[in-house]
Amino acid sequence: MTLKNRYKESIRPKLLKDLGLKNIHQVPKVVKVNVNRGLGEAASNSKALEASLNEMATITGQKALVTRAKKAIAGFKIREGMPIGCTVTLRGDRMYSFLERFINLALPRIRDFRGVNPKSFDGRGNYTVGVKEQLIFPEISFDKIDSIRGMDITIVTSARSDQEGKALLQELGMPFSKN
């Protein structure tokens, strides 16, 4: 059973009851997943940007968008319009497919993994987790990467509070640490 079907058939009715909501449309759902990677060396090294775009496309199954500097910062040696990273926004079936792979395959492959930080909510039910290396994804092979780079994964939900967001992610299978 896919994560999307599990959400519709078992998670949504359970959350409706647990959160004491009156309408099925009030139940929090995952709206989108943002996968973002900042590349400091992209301004001077175009191969790093190209490799990063390919990795992001392999991991997410969707072409990555190049993010560019909004204004020049002399201290970082960047000018306006220079590429400084890449991002992918996932919605719909691709989002659920990515979340399922991230929660069930990628997170357990992190070294010394004891669960994700339950305090990484933003106050509006959205959750962000930082990944230190792309090797946790089974699609990436160690031989094909040139350097280890991390990424930020933001799960945007329709939850109105952090408690609702946490309840949703726990039901989806997100392994929160017990601290």
From Swiss-Prot:
Tell me the GO molecular function terms: rRNA binding; structural constituent of ribosome; tRNA binding
Q: Which domain of life is it from?
A: Bacteria
InterPro entries, A to Z: Ribosomal_uL5, Ribosomal_uL5_bac-type, Ribosomal_uL5_C, Ribosomal_uL5_CS, Ribosomal_uL5_dom_sf, Ribosomal_uL5_N
Annotated Gene Ontology cellular component terms: ribonucleoprotein complex; ribosome
- Would the keyword Translocase be found if you checked this record's keyword annotation? no
Any one Gene Ontology BP term: translation
Q: Which UniProt keywords apply?
A: Ribonucleoprotein, Ribosomal protein, RNA-binding, rRNA-binding, tRNA-binding
The UniProt entry's sequence similarity note says:
Belongs to the universal ribosomal protein uL5 family.
| Function recorded in the entry | This is one of the proteins that bind and probably mediate the attachment of the 5S RNA into the large ribosomal subunit, where it forms part of the central protuberance. In the 70S ribosome it contacts protein S13 of the 30S subunit (bridge B1b), connecting the 2 subunits; this bridge is implicated in subunit movement. Contacts the P site tRNA; the 5S rRNA and some of its associated proteins might help stabilize positioning of ribosome-bound tRNAs.
* NCBIfam families documented for this protein: PRK00010.1
Record text on subunit structure and interactions:
Part of the 50S ribosomal subunit; part of the 5S rRNA/L5/L18/L25 subcomplex. Contacts the 5S rRNA and the P site tRNA. Forms a bridge to the 30S subunit in the 70S ribosome.
Question: What is the protein name given in its UniProt record?
Answer: Large ribosomal subunit protein uL5
What organism is the protein native to?
Answer: Prochlorococcus marinus (strain MIT 9301)
Q: What is the phylogenetic placement of the source species in the record? A: Bacteria, Bacillati, Cyanobacteriota, Cyanophyceae, Synechococcales
